[in-house]
């Protein structure tokens, strides 16, 4: 449930840049337009070269026909006059004698510098294009010169029509490309539109329903990734809501009891009020302190849980042997009547120092809580393979029934027998959270299967690597064990590191 009123979210603002759909359409149009322009230039150049080459071939053929027929020598006037019935202009020049011409209506065969050079005998042949004609001049063997020209207007008319055809076809191609690009883009971006609508729906309404996935392309994978994000967000919100609800429920009981005791103390100290007996006053104050301690523990556990849920951890190399030592020292301050049998190796885990320390502390606290006075708790950290080690914390308590072993790691779960003991029901939940966040595994077994009591052993599998063993002067190989006594109790510490004995 929400404790605070949720403020309305501002609608998402549209960006001023072009949409992806329009950009894809413009890209398709640009590419097609570029191809059309290049193809049009190529087609125009090829056809133009072919038409003008054909005109040159026609002029050359007509000249060769006149020369080969011998008519220019036998009857030049009649030969030149015969060309008037075709589509060419002709001129035969006999220097110092005569000039014969035959021209099409409205046309004049142009005589320029190139043609004059042929007539003077300076050139054997020339070709050139004037304003609207193609002119061929050839020097004959008898000293005369033959000039033939053809109008370019029909060719230019064809090229002009070709330009219009290419322009129209290119425009149609660009338009078709734009329409096709728009249709393809619309179909291709439909999943993106669904993702956008889903994101806006989440922002407006907190609706975390998954989006249907169609196909198996990149957009389908993007949709699946978005659905995974929605599921993770839904699970996170569910955890937050459950944590807030459970915390409110768990805090209500100690707060109510604390309030009652404080009110009773204040009432007994009011002027004229009857005084409580001294022993009852002492017990009442002790209850208040115990309830404050219980609240502090509960709040600390809640902070650790929320910190783990939010992923606010710093990963660094952690020596689990040091973690076990520090945690053991704290537990023994609270339970100096318990004997701890410790066997550890140097094992490095890349993870959160605070979280791993809290995990080890909670396991030892739980084992000590269920152990009778003077009992033994075993703590063993051993290597299983090159990349995994196992931390085992064992007690000789009443054990955990098989049907409850999965439940004890749930938040605020407390069995019927555990409700009479101090605790928040969050200790093993924190252990589970830390272990899973570090890629580990958990399991529970009986310490003494079939025994009475069977006891409980919690196994934690942790990935990592073996710590390098420093070579100390006078060190000998092999494990050493020592029983160390101090003012608060004893612990049997077995160090597999062979160089030192860990005193706790």
Curated annotation (Swiss-Prot):
Residues 186-238 form the HAMP domain. Autophosphorylated. It is found in: Cell membrane. GO terms for molecular function: ATP binding; phosphoprotein phosphatase activity; phosphorelay sensor kinase activity. Residues 48-163 are extracellular. The modification Phosphohistidine is found at residue 249. Pfam families: HAMP, HATPase_c, HisKA. Residues 487-504 have a biased composition (Polar residues). SMART domains: HAMP (SM00304), HATPase_c (SM00387), HisKA (SM00388). InterPro entries: 2C_sensor_his_kinase, HAMP_dom, HATPase_C_sf, His_kinase_dom, HisK_dim/P_dom, HisK_dim/P_sf, Sig_transdc_His_kin-like_C. Residues 1-26, 185-504 are cytoplasmic. One of its GO terms (cellular component) is plasma membrane. CDD domains: HAMP (cd06225), HATPase (cd00075), HisKA (cd00082). Residues 471-504 are annotated as: Disordered. It catalyses: ATP + protein L-histidine = ADP + protein N-phospho-L-histidine. This is Signal transduction histidine-protein kinase/phosphatase MprB. Residues 246-466 form the Histidine kinase domain. The lineage of its organism: Bacteria, Bacillati, Actinomycetota, Actinomycetes, Mycobacteriales. It comes from the Bacteria. It is a multi-pass membrane protein.
């Amino acid at each position: 449930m929400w404790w605070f009123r949720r403020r309305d979210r501002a609608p998402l603002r549209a960006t001023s840049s072009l949409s992806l759909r329009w950009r894809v359409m413009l890209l398709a149009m640009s590419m097609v337009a570029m191809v059309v322009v290049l193809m049009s230039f190529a087609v125009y150049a090829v056809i133009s070269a072919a038409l003008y080459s054909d005109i040159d071939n026609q002029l050359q053929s007509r000249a060769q026909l006149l020369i080969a027929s011998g008519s220019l020598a036998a009857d030049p006037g009649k030969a030149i006059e015969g060309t008037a019935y075709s589509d060419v202009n002709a001129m035969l020049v006999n220097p110092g004698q005569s000039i014969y011409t035959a021209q099409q209506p409205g046309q004049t065969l142009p005589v320029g510098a190139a043609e004059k050079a042929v007539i003077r005998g300076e050139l054997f042949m020339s070709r050139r294009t004037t304003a609207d004609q193609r002119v061929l001049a050839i020097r004959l063997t008898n000293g005369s010169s033959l000039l033939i020209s053809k109008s370019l207007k029909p060719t230019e008319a064809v090229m002009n029509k070709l330009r219009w055809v290419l322009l129209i076809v290119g425009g149609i191609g660009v338009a078709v490309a734009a329409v096709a690009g728009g249709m393809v883009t619309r179909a291709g971006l439909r999943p993106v539109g669904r993702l956008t609508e889903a994101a806006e729906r989440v922002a407006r309404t907190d609706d975390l329903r998954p989006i249907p996935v169609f196909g198996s392309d990149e957009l389908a994978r993007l949709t699946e990734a978005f659905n995974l994000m929605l599921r993770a967000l839904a699970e996170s919100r569910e955890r937050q809501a459950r944590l807030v609800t459970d915390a409110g429920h768990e805090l209500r009981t100690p707060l109510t009891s604390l309030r009652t005791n404080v009110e009773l103390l204040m009432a007994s100290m009011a002027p004229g009020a009857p005084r409580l007996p001294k022993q009852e006053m002492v017990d009442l104050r002790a209850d208040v302190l115990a309830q404050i301690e219980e609240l502090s523990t509960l709040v600390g556990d809640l902070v650790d849980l929320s910190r783990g849920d939010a992923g606010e951890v710093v990963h660094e190399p952690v020596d689990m042997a040091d973690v076990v030592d520090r945690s053991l020292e704290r537990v023994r301050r609270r339970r100096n009547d318990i004997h701890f049998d410790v066997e550890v190796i140097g094992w490095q885990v890349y993870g959160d120092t605070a979280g791993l320390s809290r995990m080890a502390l909670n396991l030892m606290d739980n084992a000590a809580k269920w152990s009778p006075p003077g009992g033994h708790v075993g703590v063993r950290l051993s290597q299983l393979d090159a990349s995994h080690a196992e931390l085992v914390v064992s007690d000789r308590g009443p054990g955990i029934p098989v049907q409850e072993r999965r439940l004890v790691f749930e938040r605020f779960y407390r069995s019927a027998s555990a409700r009479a003991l101090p605790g928040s029901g969050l200790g093993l939940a924190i252990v589970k959270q830390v272990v899973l966040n570090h890629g580990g595994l958990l399991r529970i077994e009986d310490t003494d299967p079939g025994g009475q009591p069977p006891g409980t052993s919690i196994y934690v599998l942790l990935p990592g690597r073996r710590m390098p063993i420093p070579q100390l002067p006078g060190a000998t190989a092999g494990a050493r064990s020592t029983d160390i006594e101090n003012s608060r109790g004893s612990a049997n510490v077995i160090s597999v590191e062979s160089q030192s004995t860990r005193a706790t």
